[in-house]
């Protein structure tokens, strides 16, 4: 633990996975972490689409930010006199970007923003798109710092926390959502212990979260996903803090597979459960979790580790990437607009409209 408390929590935020050079996009290849730190260059919208699909970039906010730059790159491949004509010509590329990861509502939200920008733009439509992409990234970082402060305020001094998947700088423009709350809680001296689940099958916790925290000098203990209940029973954890890829109008939240079972386990052991995500992740048009499209990935991902097969030939595997945690199991939803405790449809409506 770092006890000299920094006056500025930027000390705990050193990683940046998305770099726009002005000409092309550089993405930290998250498939190769933690042992290889390598950036992949994207020179076209198709490069960006493939990077999203291949999990070179992941995390709902980061996917949205990258899609914005993908739209900017697509704009270089067409000619148009104004934004309306450009939008008509760009629509196929925008739809391909959206199809790369359909569960992440941020992706659709960013593409909708780019469409609105184009609809209002004149001859300078390319510059308008670039300004919008920059704004999306800047707003995300600002929102994350805001969420960090709101979420940390809920955590008593001396608490232990458990997180799942990766919700930090690697998944956002910087600082992170759930990991941003943890960063803020560490900086304020509220959090005494941090645990991270490995997050099979892509091991985002083991490969990414613990590496990211290590870069920032934050002590973290890795656990097997299957050890979470025993950890909670031991009394070392007071809060589970996770992100979300989509939050419904009733407070249900879709997040990385394994989140739902953590919420059930937390409720049984009297451990609080916090979901941290930007307001862009809230989808008031989706009334409940049952309506969310759950992405299924290649079953082969479950049959080995880092390309080495560990399962006998001929075995079937089921590989949903997300699950849905009912709002009734969530103690707090934290966005940049504030905290919703014990979320339900009425509270969600009061905060997010519709």
Curated annotation (Swiss-Prot):
Catalytic activity, EC: 5.3.1.23
Family the entry assigns: Belongs to the eIF-2B alpha/beta/delta subunits family. MtnA subfamily.
Catalysed reaction equations from the record: 5-(methylsulfanyl)-alpha-D-ribose 1-phosphate = 5-(methylsulfanyl)-D-ribulose 1-phosphate
GO molecular function terms noted in the UniProt entry: S-methyl-5-thioribose-1-phosphate isomerase activity
Protein name as annotated: Methylthioribose-1-phosphate isomerase
Functional description taken from the UniProt entry: Catalyzes the interconversion of methylthioribose-1-phosphate (MTR-1-P) into methylthioribulose-1-phosphate (MTRu-1-P).
InterPro entries named in the record: IF-2B-related (IPR000649), IF-M1Pi (IPR005251), IF_2B-like_C (IPR042529), Initiation_fac_2B_a/b/d (IPR011559), M1Pi_N (IPR027363), NagB/RpiA_transferase-like (IPR037171)
One Pfam family it belongs to: IF-2B
Residue positions of the active site: 245 (proton donor)
SUPFAM superfamilies the record matches: NagB/RpiA/CoA transferase-like (SSF100950)
Keywords associated with the record: Amino-acid biosynthesis, Isomerase, Methionine biosynthesis
Pathway as given in its UniProt record: Amino-acid biosynthesis; L-methionine biosynthesis via salvage pathway; L-methionine from S-methyl-5-thio-alpha-D-ribose 1-phosphate: step 1/6
Residues carrying the site annotation Transition state stabilizer: 165
Species the sequence originates in: Xylella fastidiosa (strain 9a5c)
One GO BP annotation of this record: L-methionine salvage from methylthioadenosine
Residues that, per the record, bind substrate: 58-60, 101, 204, 255-256
